[in-house]
Structures are given as structure tokens and as C-alpha cells.
């Protein structure tokens, strides 16, 4: 009898552990079915402009299901079956969206135009879609690609990729493969950080990520993939490889430069030389543009304002766009210096800086938020999870409030998109002050333990 009691007690304890795990695993399958149903409807639409409210409403619904999934992954110890559901569903979501004919962004047509320009032996940093005599390079299905009055804004590695691909479905497929590559690298990073692999759901199921890459074909996935590879090599103490991958990421999109100081504190001077040499090597093919090499980037910085938040306040305080940009740059530099001084972990610094630049920038398209979403796998900040979901409100059409006036997003949509996030951040800052926490990353709920407590609340 004395031997039976411990055996029964152990059996009951195992049941208590397995029962919620099995229920949550089934729950994840149900969530995946719901998200798939949303994306099947989205992919079947022939004209998203005609059903924008339904499109955004369903994306927000998918976002709610996604957040429930993140909560379960954080709350429960899950097994192999749950991980398989997460990964298989991640592939299924992308396969469902790939055939979509109508997309919420037309950037892929600019990629295609840049690729045609290069195959015609022209320099994309010099010519632009409205250049005289280049009508034959246009896609008749979409004859007006974005930024038709400006040379390209994209760095050389992205441009080389555009040159190798010819069709719009081709761009979407390559973008999606790189996106799935991000899932793989995140799992390696989670393993290196001794964290549960199930946390990859925070990226793999995110609706903003899925719409940006599988549906729209944005090539930010190239920059994110190489950036995550750079971080993996950094945290596993392979500095030369990390700086090489960081250079490739910078050559895809410019945002990884935010983490340059974080990397420099962990590598030798020779590795910095490798970073610079790679950048120069990729720009060589386009140097015949001369002083026009950065014309597109300058035009972007000067003219584009879309879906920003804090920047509008900074511009109002400063009295000009240039003044607002200067304040934003100083805030970012201060954040970079603070994180370097505190020796913040690279993955945490990545979340803070990629998220911070989006809140301060005059332009924050929904797909830009994909830059920061991978780091929710390690620091699942409740406020930023919410931001990753509400960012789809940035797909609402911008309108002009007068003849000749620029297109603007409505104050209502911006308030719905950003307001709850700022309220959440302000609340946690206030709680931190009340409890007299030492000033630091905990104030915004971004410490490793703090984010889990915050999300659980």
C-alpha cells in the first residue's frame, strides 16, 4: 500500500501537466484553422480596394488569434506536437497567401522595374520610371510603379536580387522563402539562447509578416534574414561572420545600421574592415551614378511622410520637418548610447532600436514593423505585440484634405493604430515610477522577465 500511494501521486501529477498541454496543443490547431480561413478569404479577393474595411477587420481578427497563440506559448510548456503545428501552420499560411492577385502594396512592381532597368544595362540609381524613352520597361499590368519620379531607394544587394527575378510571382516566392528562412534562423537563435523553440510562433504566425512577404512580396525579408544570421553569429561568438552578415543586411535595407555600435562593442577592428570592404564591393557596380548614387534616398528622406506617429509631435514642437527629424535623430542616438553603456543584450537592443525608429520616423509603412517582430520571440512585450497587430491599420487609404494637398492618413486611424500602444507603454512607465524601479529598460516593460510578466497581465 505504501508503494502505491507515491505511484498514484506521480501519475496524477503527470496528468495535471499533460492535460493543459494537450488542450493547448488542440487549441493551437484551432487557432491555425481560424487564421487560415481568414487568409483564404483575403487571397480570393480580386480587388482589395473595394473591400478595405473587411480586409483590415479580418486582419485584426487574425491578430487576436495570433496574440492568443503567443500567450499560450508563453504560458504553457508544450511538446513536439505543438511545435509541429506551429511550423506546419506557418508554411500553410504562406502557401495560402502566395496566389493572391490583389495586394495592399505595389512595391513589388518597382522591384520588377528596377530589375528590368539593370537587365537593359541601365543604372537604377540614375534613371526612374518617368524618365523619357523608358516606357518600354513598364509592366502593362501596372504601368505606374511607386516613386515614378525618383531613382531607386534600395541598396545594392536588393538591386542585384531584383535583377535576377523577372515576374511578380517570382518576387513573392523568393521573399517568402527568405521569410521562412527567418523562421529557421530564429529557431537556431532560440536554441542558442536556451529558450523554448515554440516561441518562434511570435514571428511565424504574425499577420503583418504574412501580408508583407507572402502576399505582397516585400523584400525586407532579405534584410531581416541576413540581420538574424548576423545576430546568430554574434551571440555564438563568431565575430567575422557576424560583421559579414551585418554588411549584407545593410546592403539590403539601411535599418541594421542602428545596431552597428552594438556589434562594434563585440568585435575587433579587423572585422569592421570586413564590413566596410563588403559594402564598397557591392556598390562598385553602381558607382558610375557618381553624385546621383543617393538621389533616391535623399528624395525619400525629404518628401515621404506616411503613417508616422511621434514624428508629427516632434515636427510641431520644432516648427519644421527638418527640426523634427533632428530631434528624432538625437533621441535615437541617445538610445543607442544608453543601450551600449548598459551593455544591453543584442537581441534586446534590436527590439528597442528597430521599434524606436518606427515610432520616431515620418514614414512607418505596415511592412516596416516586420523589422522588429522577430525579437518578440525573445522579449514578448505586450505593447509591441499590440503594435505588430494594429500596424495593419496603416493599410487604410490615405486621402487628400484639399486640392493639391498631400495624401494623409486620418487622425482617427492613426489614433486607433498607435493610441493603445502609447497608453500601454505609458502605464508601465507609470507603474515603474510608482514602485521606484531603478531607471532602465524595465520602465517600458522590455526586460526578459518583465515582458513575460507584462504579457501575462
PLM ranges: what are they?
Residues 80-81, 85, 186-208, 237, ...:
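Transmembrane-helix signature of polytopic, membrane-embedded enzymes
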Residues 174, 183, 279-283, 299-366, ...:
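Aromatic/glycine/proline-enriched transmembrane-helix motif characteristic
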Residues 183-188, 211, 222-238, 354:
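Specific aromatic-rich, kink-prone transmembrane helix
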Residues 65-72, 164, 169-197, 224, ...:
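Transmembrane-helix motifs of polytopic, lipid-linked glycan transferases
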Residues 86-93, 266-288:
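Hydrophobic alpha-helical membrane-interfacial segments at the cytosolic entry of transmembrane helices
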Amino acid at each position: 500500500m505504501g508503494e502505491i500511494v507515491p505511484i498514484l501521486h506521480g501519475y496524477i501529477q503527470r496528468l495535471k501537466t499533460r492535460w493543459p498541454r494537450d488542450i493547448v496543443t488542440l487549441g493551437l490547431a484551432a487557432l491555425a484553422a481560424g487564421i487560415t480561413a481568414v487568409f483564404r478569404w483575403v487571397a480570393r479577393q480580386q480587388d482589395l480596394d473595394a473591400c478595405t474595411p473587411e480586409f483590415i477587420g479580418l486582419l485584426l481578427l487574425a491578430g487576436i488569434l495570433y496574440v492568443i497563440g503567443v500567450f499560450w506559448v508563453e504560458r504553457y510548456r508544450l511538446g513536439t506536437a505543438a511545435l509541429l503545428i506551429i511550423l506546419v501552420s506557418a508554411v500553410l499560411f504562406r502557401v495560402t497567401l502566395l496566389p493572391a492577385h490583389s495586394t495592399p502594396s505595389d512595391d513589388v512592381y518597382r522591384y520588377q522595374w528596377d530589375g528590368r532597368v539593370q537587365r537593359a544595362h541601365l543604372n537604377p540609381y540614375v534613371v526612374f520610371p518617368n524618365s523619357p524613352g523608358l516606357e518600354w520597361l513598364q509592366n502593362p499590368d501596372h504601368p505606374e510603379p511607386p516613386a515614378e519620379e525618383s531613382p531607386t531607394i534600395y541598396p545594392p544587394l536588393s538591386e542585384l536580387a531584383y535583377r535576377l527575378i523577372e515576374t511578380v510571382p517570382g518576387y513573392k516566392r523568393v521573399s517568402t522563402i527568405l521569410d521562412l528562412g527567418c523562421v529557421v534562423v530564429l529557431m537556431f537563435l532560440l536554441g542558442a539562447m536556451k529558450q523554448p523553440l515554440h516561441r518562434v510562433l511570435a514571428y511565424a504566425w504574425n499577420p503583418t509578416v504574412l501580408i508583407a512577404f507572402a502576399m505582397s512580396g516585400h523584400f525586407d525579408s532579405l534584410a531581416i534574414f541576413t540581420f538574424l544570421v548576423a545576430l546568430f553569429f554574434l551571440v555564438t561568438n563568431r565575430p567575422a561572420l557576424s560583421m559579414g552578415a551585418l554588411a549584407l543586411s545593410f546592403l539590403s535595407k539601411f535599418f541594421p545600421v542602428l545596431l552597428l555600435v552594438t556589434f562594434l562593442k563585440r568585435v575587433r577592428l579587423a572585422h569592421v574592415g570586413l564590413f566596410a570592404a563588403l559594402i564598397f564591393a557591392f556598390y562598385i557596380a553602381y558607382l558610375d551614378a557618381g553624385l546621383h548614387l543617393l538621389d533616391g534616398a535623399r528624395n525619400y528622406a525629404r518628401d515621404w511622410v506616411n503613417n508616422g506617429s511621434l514624428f508629427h509631435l516632434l515636427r510641431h514642437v520644432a516648427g519644421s520637418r527638418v527640426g523634427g527629424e533632428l530631434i528624432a535623430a538625437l533621441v535615437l542616438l541617445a538610445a543607442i548610447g544608453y543601450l551600449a553603456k548598459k551593455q544591453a543584450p543584442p537581441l534586446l537592443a534590436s527590439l528597442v532600436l528597430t521599434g524606436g525608429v518606427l515610432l520616431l520616423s515620418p514614414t512607418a509603412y505596415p511592412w516596416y514593423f516586420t523589422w522588429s517582430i522577430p525579437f518578440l520571440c525573445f522579449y514578448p512585450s505586450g505593447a509591441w505585440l499590440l503594435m505588430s497587430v494594429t500596424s495593419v491599420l496603416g493599410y487604410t487609404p490615405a486621402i487628400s484634405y484639399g486640392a493639391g494637398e498631400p495624401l494623409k492618413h486620418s487622425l482617427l486611424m492613426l489614433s486607433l493604430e498607435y493610441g493603445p500602444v502609447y497608453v500601454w507603454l505609458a502605464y508601465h512607465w507609470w507603474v515603474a515610477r510608482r514602485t521606484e524601479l531603478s531607471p532602465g529598460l524595465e520602465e517600458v516593460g522590455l526586460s526578459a522577465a518583465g515582458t513575460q510578466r507584462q504579457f501575462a497581465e
